[in-house]
From Swiss-Prot:
PANTHER family: ATP-DEPENDENT 6-PHOSPHOFRUCTOKINASE, LIVER TYPE, PHOSPHOFRUCTOKINASE. Coiled coil: none annotated. Glycans are attached at S529. This is ATP-dependent 6-phosphofructokinase, liver type. The lineage of its organism: Eukaryota, Metazoa, Chordata, Craniata, Vertebrata. Homo- and heterotetramers. Phosphofructokinase (PFK) enzyme functions as a tetramer composed of different combinations of 3 types of subunits, called PFKM (where M stands for Muscle), PFKL (Liver) and PFKP (Platelet). The composition of the PFK tetramer differs according to the tissue type it is present in. In muscles, it is composed of 4 PFKM subunits (also called M4). In the liver, the predominant form is a tetramer of PFKL subunits (L4). In erythrocytes, both PFKM and PFKL subunits randomly tetramerize to form M4, L4 and other combinations (ML3, M2L2, M3L). GO terms for cellular component: 6-phosphofructokinase complex; cytosol; extracellular exosome; extracellular region; ficolin-1-rich granule lumen; membrane; secretory granule lumen.
């Protein structure tokens, strides 16, 4: 990956013009992308034009193409849809339409186009690019432009961003809008659950996605739905009987509701559509259950974008500008995609080709291949859904007993992880215990065996159902060892924050004294602070960022109404500045003070002066985030006094300490799924390790790799031994020594109009799409 030279970049932006348009169906997060492209373009010295109403505006020209300034895209990051409008355009599909579009671009000197839309919009852009030379020749022949003009603007560069709630584009893990659409679906499912339980009802929910089952699949996984229909994996013949059996069985076990999720493109093995009304009639006729159909429709496109979509779009928008600046006549039109947590550029047509192949595989009834072509994460979701949805009695009972506990502060997604771990353990024939109140509960013997149905309905619950404590094992090792012996525990799964990691480390270090601790252990990092070594993302931090972001959106609205007001907002996170930084990007904050990025009085002075300058423009509001432990002396109160004094007569100041509301209510779809997957993967790893260390009728594990932290690192799931992570940990400040998200701070400062050296900006490389990159199990 190449670091970019600032001066070269400034020069490369000068004299260039970038046009940005949104096309096709709208998606939440498009505004964040428009904002990022506009501001990054202006930042590097280019002119940026907003093209209104998609390709229609491009063809019609005139008032539809306007030059943007920094303020044009202010206060739009929190809005759903697209402020520059989108339209499906017939004219652009004709040669005349594209010729008119080329003329309009040349009139404004635009030779760089950033297109935000679905695969149709991006394919259209590529056709436009390939015809560009001949379109200009025709314009010269018609006498509309001179030959000199044609030579000056002889080449068109294209960078695409995929904006589609369906997540149906090959080559990217997530498209802009998908996460927000999942938020809408989960909000509806959570609301429906309460009414269904009151009446003992069955609900058939139809979700969008055209020919792609991603939304249906992920919402089924995140809600623990009883049955699922997706186009990529049609049910076996005779599914009607299986489904009714399953629903009857769930009801007889005391469940008061059944949820059936159906993708709008659902089909059976013969390609015949399966409709929600057909499924409803089937349940009513066969089982006599009170059944209702809810078609979610365009609700899924609406509402405010989630934090994930705002950050994804901002990151992709900036990367798209870099791709346009670095493009040459020989580089292919590219699309900026996401792989793990990395931005990657892929050739647009390779992705479109692969996306078409999925549809072709489905048309030819090659369903297994279609699932594979959707990518590793789709396939993985499908396998995990099948594993957890329905209990299959284990082939044989194992001799192993495992215990699961929560340690640290409550975090959203803990219950999802416990649920999936319990069910995976049971399906492997293990005896599964849960421990209440963390290590303290283990010392006191608060241990109980659980069955498959004991964890039903846990997925959408926030906090910790098992109860959690911060106490470390150190002071009560004797009692803990005693209970491990009494219950015959062979493995521990600890779901929690920094204390969970530190606690397991203490148990491992005590193995020399207590043979009972020579068991297999795994930590699932779950904390809103995202400060556990061995993973890029902790469970619960996505929910926390969304909770903090919603609060900041409201605070910003208050500031907009009051005029000339600056809010200083304090976030949690201990010494770790992840929450403050990521929330800052999601709400378009002016600054975010964190411990990892040391600041002094000079920096504060620059910030205050920047704020005073900003108040002279039309944007008369400010938002500053401060992590709770970012500085010993520059406290929230100090910042309030400083800003109040320096801003006297220009702006006034207020503070807000967000506090425990950041632990969030119901977990976000990301945390429900991430928790579910971590629970499954951790349990599979524990099972495998137990078989490895089982000798002569007993478990004896004392190798470093028998006690690990599971986490997502860059693009894959990794298991890191706690003893090896010790050297990478700053125990005094309770966080990893190196943190990947610090690179995001550059984005925060640039989008807030701070002039900074871009030497640290790392732009994505151009990679290629192959079947291997898609079906390779990237972990998630």
């Amino acid at each position: 990956m190449a670091a970019v030279d600032l001066e070269k970049l400034r020069a490369s932006g000068a004299g260039k013009a970038i046009g940005v348009l949104t096309s096709g169906g709208d998606a939440q997060g498009m505004n964040a992308a428009v904002r990022a492209v506009t501001r990054m373009g202006i930042y590097v010295g280019a002119k940026v034009f907003l093209i209104y109403e998609g390709y229609e505006g491009l063809v019609e020209g005139g008032e539809n193409i306007k030059q943007a300034n920094w303020l044009s895209v202010s206060n739009i990051i929190q809005l759903g849809g697209t402020i520059i409008g989108s339209a499906r355009c017939k004219a652009f599909t004709t040669r005349e339409g594209r010729r008119a579009a080329a003329y309009n671009l040349v009139q404004h000197g635009i030779t760089n186009l950033c297109v935000i839309g679905g695969d149709g919009s991006l394919t259209g852009a590529n056709i436009f690019r390939s015809e560009w030379g001949s379109l200009l020749e025709e314009l010269v022949a018609e006498g509309k432009i001179s030959e000199t003009t044609a030579r000056t603007y002889s080449h068109l560069n294209i960078a695409g961003l995929v904006g589609s709630i369906d997540n149906d584009f090959c080559g990217t893990d997530m498209t802009i809008g998908t996460d927000s659409a999942l938020h809408r679906i989960m909000e509806v499912i959570d609301a429906i659950t309460t009414t269904a339980q009151s009446h003992q009802r069955t609900f058939v929910l139809e979700v969008m996605g055209r020919h792609c089952g991603y939304l249906a699949l992920v919402s089924a996984l995140a809600s623990g739905a009883d049955w699922l229909f997706i186009p990529e994996a049609p049910p076996e013949d005779g599914w009607e009987n299986f489904m009714c059996e399953r629903l009857g069985e769930t009801r007889s076990r005391g469940s008061r509701l059944n949820i059936i999720i159906i993708a709008e493109g659902a089909i059976d093995r013969n390609g015949k559509p399966i409709s929600s009304s057909y499924v409803k009639d089937l349940v009513v006729q066969r089982l006599g259950f009170d059944t209702r159909v809810t078609v979610l429709g365009h609700v899924q496109r609406g509402g405010t974008p989630s934090a994930f979509d705002r950050i994804l779009s901002s990151k992709m928008g900036m990367e798209a500008v870099m791709a346009l600046l670095e493009a040459t006549p020989d580089t292919p039109a590219c699309v900026v995609t996401l792989s793990g947590n990395q931005s990657v550029r892929l050739p647009l047509m390779e992705c479109v080709q692969m996306t078409k192949e999925v549809q072709k595989a489905m048309d030819d009834k090659r369903f297994d291949e279609a699932t594979q072509l959707r990518g590793g994460s789709f396939e993985n979701n499908w396998n995990i859904y099948k594993l957890l949805a329905h209990q299959k009695p284990p082939k044989e009972k194992s001799n192993f007993s495992l215990a699961i506990l929560n340690v640290g502060a409550p975090a959203a997604g803990m219950n999802a992880a416990v649920r999936s771990a319990v069910r995976t353990g049971i399906s492997h024939g293990h005896t599964v215990y849960v421990v209440h109140d963390g290590f303290e509960g283990l010392a006191k013997g608060q241990v109980q065996e659980v069955g498959w149905h004991d964890v039903a309905g846990w997925l959408g619950r926030g906090g910790s159902m098992l109860g959690t404590k911060r106490t470390l094992p150190k002071g009560q090792l004797e009692s803990i060892v005693e209970n491990i012996r009494i219950y015959g525990i062979h493995a521990l799964l600890v779901v929690g924050g920094f204390e969970a990691y530190e606690g397991v480390l203490q148990l491992v270090e005590a193995r020399g004294r207590y043979e009972e601790l020579c068991i297999v252990m795994c930590v699932i990092p779950a904390t809103i602070s995202n400060n556990v070594p061995g993973t890029d993302f902790s469970l619960g931090s996505d929910t926390a960022v969304n909770a903090a972001m919603e609060s900041c959106d409201r605070i910003k609205q208050s500031a907009s109404g009051t005029k000339r007001r600056v809010f200083i907002v304090e976030t949690m996170g201990g010494y770790c500045g992840y929450l403050a930084t990521v929330t800052g990007i999601a709400v378009g904050a002016d600054a975010a003070y964190v411990f990892e990025d040391p600041f002094n009085i000079h920096d504060l002075k620059v910030n205050v002066e920047h704020m005073t300058e900003k108040m002279k423009t039309d944007i008369q509001r400010g938002l500053v985030l401060r992590n709770e432990k970012c500085h010993d002396y520059y406290t929230t109160e100090f910042l309030y006094n400083l800003y109040s004094s320096e801003g006297k007569g220009v702006f006034d100041c207020r503070t807000n300490v967000l506090g425990h509301l950041q632990q969030g209510g119901a977990p976000t779809p990301f945390d429900r799924n991430y928790g579910t997957k971590l629970g499954v993967k951790a349990m599979l790893w524990l099972s495998e390790k137990l078989r490895e260390v089982y000798r002569k009728g007993r478990v004896f594990a004392n190798a470093p790799d028998s006690a690990c932290v599971i986490g997502l690192k860059k693009k894959a799931v990794a298991f890191s031994p706690v003893t090896e992570l010790k050297k990478d940990t700053d125990f005094e400040h309770r966080m990893p020594r190196e943190q990947w998200w610090l690179s995001l701070r550059l984005m925060l400062k640039m989008l807030a109009q701070y002039r900074i050296s871009m030497a640290a900006y790392v732009s994505g490389e151009l990679e290629h799409v192959t079947r291997r990159t898609l079906s390779m199990d990237k972990g998630f």
